[in-house]
Amino acid sequence: MSKSNASAEISGLQICIVNTDAQIDAALDSGDRRAFRVWCLRRASLIARVERVLVEAATAKAA
């Protein structure tokens, strides 16, 4: 994966994480435990994807 592709993907994922954080806040404000759990799982998934992109970029750079 090229550096620019990785950077673009991470930027997109950051936007998704920020939007997910807003959904988590909304779920907390409304007391919706189910929505809170769903959005927290989504956020964890997005963060894991960022980690995978970083590892792929570092591996490609080392090769």
Descriptions of predicted regions:
Residues 1-5:
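Short, charged, low-complexity loops and linkers
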